[in-house]
C-alpha cells in the first residue's frame, strides 16, 4: 500500500512538471502570448503571476478585472475556448504564470527573459571596422604632417589631440563589446562615435600646417560634418533595444570615406610652402 502511494505521488509530480511550459521573450517582442486552453469554462477564468492576480474574467457577467500593473492584458479568444493571455512588453514580468478556472489550474507557464544583442553581429562588426580604419587613417595623416613640417607648438598640439581621440575611441570600443544594451555598452558606443567631431579639428590643423586650406578641403570638411550629423542622428535612434543601426553605420562610413579623401589630398597635392627638415 505504501508503494502504491509513493507511486501515485511520483506520477502526480511528474504530471505537474511536464505540464509546465517555459517561454522565452526578449525586448524585441512588442507583445507576448502566454498559451492556455480551457474546454467549456464555467464561472470564471483567472490568470496569475506567481500569487498575484493579473486578469479575472467573469463568464456570467462578461466582465474583466485587470491588475493596475498589467493594464494591457487581455484574453485571446473566448469563443474558441482559447484563453491565452496577451500582454504588451511594458507590462511583462518574468515569473510563473498560471491559468485557472473554478475547477483548478489548467496551465502553468514559466516566462523567462532572454537578453539579446543591441545590434546584430553584422552591424557590430562594421562599426568596429569603420572606427578602426578611421583611426588608422587619422594616424597616417598626423604622421605625414609630422614628417612634412618642422616641429612646432601647433604640431605638438595636433599630435596630442590625435592621441586623445584615439584613446577615447579605443576605450569606447572595449566598453561596447559585446553589443549588449546596458549602461556600460551605451557609454562605450558614445565614446566610439561622439569624438568623431574632433577629427574635423585635426583635419583643419593638418591642412593649415601644410598650407593647403582650399575649396577642396572645405568640401571634405563639409562632407565629414554631414557624416557626423548622420552618426548623431543614428545614435539618437539607437538608444533602445532591437534597432536597425543602418543610419549610424552610414554616418561612420561617411566619416571613414572623408578620412580617405583627406589623406589622398595631403599626399597627392603637395604644398610649395612646406618646410622640410
From Swiss-Prot:
This is Protein OPG166. Keywords: Glycoprotein, Host membrane, Membrane, Transmembrane, Transmembrane helix. GO terms for biological process: positive regulation of cell-cell adhesion; positive regulation of inflammatory response; positive regulation of phagocytosis. It holds the Pfam family CD47. InterPro entries: CD47 (IPR006704), CD47-like_TM (IPR013147), CD47_Vset (IPR013270), Ig-like_fold (IPR013783). GO terms for molecular function: thrombospondin receptor activity. It is found in: Host membrane. Gene3D superfamilies: Immunoglobulins (2.60.40.10). The chain crosses the membrane at residues 124-144, 156-176, 186-206, 219-239, 247-267. Glycans are attached at residues 29, 58. It comes from the Viruses. GO terms for cellular component: extracellular exosome; host cell membrane; plasma membrane. The lineage of its organism: Viruses, Varidnaviria, Bamfordvirae, Nucleocytoviricota, Pokkesviricetes. Promotes, when overexpressed, the influx of extracellular Ca(2+), leading to membrane permeability and host cell necrosis. Belongs to the orthopoxvirus OPG166 protein family. It is a multi-pass membrane protein.
